[in-house]
């Protein structure tokens, strides 16, 4: 299992967007929509400025086999950042990862999330060699729950007080998709 840049990036599967490597120069646009109250409500991000994202870029730039991978979801027309998607908690030993994604509200409700999640999950199984891809989703994030279910993820459990979210314990659903179950 390797993701050291040798594997071609997945195709988005959606006419509105394409995928490319996330770059440090994307931080202001990424922060702009992550700070939107409609996005904040359903995520565990606790950002004060675009500078708070910089440590993430250090991890994404690492060539280590367990380093997180994050791709930019960009509009085909104009190239503006519309979201990000990738893998965290990568275990080369167990061939597992956790998928994470976020989209700007401007592209919600257009099938973008379902398309890019399917594309990146298939890439994770076929190109990166994962056997299991899981997702944790805040219980109130009904849109993301529907995306995961449309993408053949199965609900595996309920994680009480799983993460602190802006000073409060948050409950999450655990979903997973297994390579053999595709």
Question: Residue spans of the language-model regions?
Answer:
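Conserved catalytic-core motifs of GNAT/GCN5-like acyltransferases
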Residues: 134-136, 154-172
């Amino acid at each position: 299992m390797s993701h050291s840049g040798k594997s071609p990036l997945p195709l988005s599967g959606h006419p509105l967007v394409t995928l490319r490597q996330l770059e440090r120069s994307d931080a202001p646009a990424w922060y702009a929509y992550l700070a939107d109250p409609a996005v904040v409500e359903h995520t565990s991000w606790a950002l004060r400025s675009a500078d708070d994202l910089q440590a993430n870029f250090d991890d994404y730039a690492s060539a280590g086999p367990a380093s997180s991978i994050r791709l930019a979801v960009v509009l085909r027309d104009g190239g503006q950042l519309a979201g990000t998607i990738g893998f965290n908690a990568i275990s080369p030993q167990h061939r597992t990862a956790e998928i994470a994604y976020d989209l700007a509200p401007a592209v919600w409700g257009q099938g973008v999330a379902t398309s890019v999640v399917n594309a990146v999950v298939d890439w994770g199984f076929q190109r990166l060699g994962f056997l299991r891809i899981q997702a944790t989703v805040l219980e109130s994030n009904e849109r993301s729950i529907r995306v995961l279910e449309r993408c053949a993820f199965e609900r595996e459990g309920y994680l009480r007080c799983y993460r602190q979210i802006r000073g409060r314990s948050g409950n999450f659903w655990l979903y997973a998709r297994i390579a053999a179950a595709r």
